[in-house]
Design a protein with these regions (language model features):
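Type-3 copper protein
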Residues: 2-284, 302-304, 315-320
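C-terminal structured domains
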Residues: 224-393
């Protein structure tokens, strides 16, 4: 059901939007009261709002009661910290920059097989076979299995992506793993270990994020790469907290608007309860909405407005006039593989050309799959994977 009562996911206060669409009546009165209660709760100090929060839950339950319970309200806590966040030394910053360069080199040079990579390469060949190169085709025609070529075979399910064991970088990790076991130490590699490998500056991400856990051990700052590593676009992991820092917001906006016209994909996910998680803010000029209303209908690109062509060795999304190069993005951390095939293909083809489809598979992941014990893995002085045992029960 598509209704203007269903609020946009981006750049909108959902409750304010809903109130603006409702006429005066019992529901509107109840929601206005609820809005005031939430605002009063937000003004309280941490620890003072328990009773009011329970009243809010009761009010929401009186409006609509979940049959099997559920969370009626998400509560975000913001801690004001007056200390110094500048705890990273210049040496640590330089190490992070070298780590970022290392990831770019791995994305460019590691040889992979199977999974998304092979499937999208086959999709390229099918497209060229039917339409040729340098020819812009309506996207809705391409994905029509009768008139076009449908969707990649990988979307039907299949083998996952793997790294070729003959890959030189994989072999280097294998050698360092064996040395670590013999010496009883950890696996450590350096920028110089990848000096023979180049990066393709014309075909790399405009920006990406790295996620770290920071610990102070014996007065020294120690960096641990986060379990999810990061994301393929600056700001994606910020979600609904994106607007808390205007300085950070402007920096991210400048990074992401260098080479393409970014189009934010705003959608209600298949798992409706995840809509709270992906509610976010976006500075993109254009948007394409799925299963919900647009926050900016004047700058919305419908599926019928999107064209696709293959040229210069890769796919390009454009508008009908071919002037704007489009890149479809999601300013959230939801895995697009779990969503509709149309949305998934827009993201995959936008990101595949920039190596992002390889973001979650690295040589140390292969080691962890095949070995009983993996020592701590360091890139220079940064821990990218802690020691682990693989136990079968």
């Amino acid at each position: 059901l598509i209704s203007d009562l269903r609020p946009p996911i981006c750049n909108i206060n959902s409750l304010d939007y809903l109130l603006s669409k409702l006429e005066e009546g019992t529901l509107c009165t109840d929601l206005t009261t609820l809005k005031k209660m939430i605002e009063d709760y937000n003004d309280l100090n941490i620890g003072e709002g328990r009773d009011l929060l329970l009243q809010i839950f009761d009010k929401m339950e009186s409006i609509y009661k979940y049959d099997n319970g559920g969370n009626y309200l998400k509560v975000d806590s913001l801690a004001e910290y007056e200390g110094d966040f500048n705890i990273l030394s210049e040496t640590a910053r330089e190490s992070i920059e070298r780590l970022a360069e290392m990831f770019v080199k791995l994305n460019t040079n590691v040889k992979r097989r199977g999974g998304r990579k092979n499937s999208l390469e086959e999709y390229q060949l099918k497209f060229i076979g039917k339409y040729g190169e340098n020819c812009s085709i309506p996207f809705v025609e391409v994905i029509n299995k009768d008139a076009g070529i449908g969707f990649p075979e990988y979307y039907k399910g299949g083998e996952g992506e793997a790294i070729e064991l003959s890959d030189p970088i994989m072999q280097m990790f294998e050698k360092k793993y064996e040395e670590a076991l013999l010496n009883g130490g950890h696996i450590e590699f350096y920028s110089k270990d990848l000096d023979d490998f180049q990066t393709d500056q014309s075909n790399s991400l405009d920006s990406f994020e790295l996620n770290f856990n920071i610990k102070i051990i014996n007065n020294d700052v120690k960096l641990y790469l986060g379990a999810n590593i990061g994301s393929g676009q600056a700001g994606r992991s910020f979600g609904r907290f994106y607007g808390l820092s205007e300085t950070v917001r402007e920096t991210i906006k400048n990074l992401n608007h260098q080479n393409n016209t970014n189009v934010e994909l705003s959608f209600v996910p298949k798992q409706i309860r995840l809509a709270n998680v992906i509610q976010n803010y976006s500075d993109e000029s254009y948007n394409t909405s799925f299963f919900t209303t647009s926050w900016d209908s004047e700058n919305e690109l419908r599926l019928e407005d999107i064209y696709i062509r293959y040229s210069d060795g890769k796919f390009h999304f454009t508008t009908i006039d071919g002037k704007n190069e489009l890149k479809f993005t999601m300013n959230n951390m939801l895995n697009s593989d779990s969503q509709s095939r149309v949305l998934r293909l827009l993201v995959d083809l936008s990101e595949f050309e920039y190596g992002l489809s390889h973001w979650s598979l690295f040589p140390w992941d292969i080691l962890a799959q095949e070995r009983v014990y993996i020592p701590e893995i360091l890139f220079e002085d940064i821990t990218i994977a802690t020691a682990q045992w693989n136990l079968s029960v």
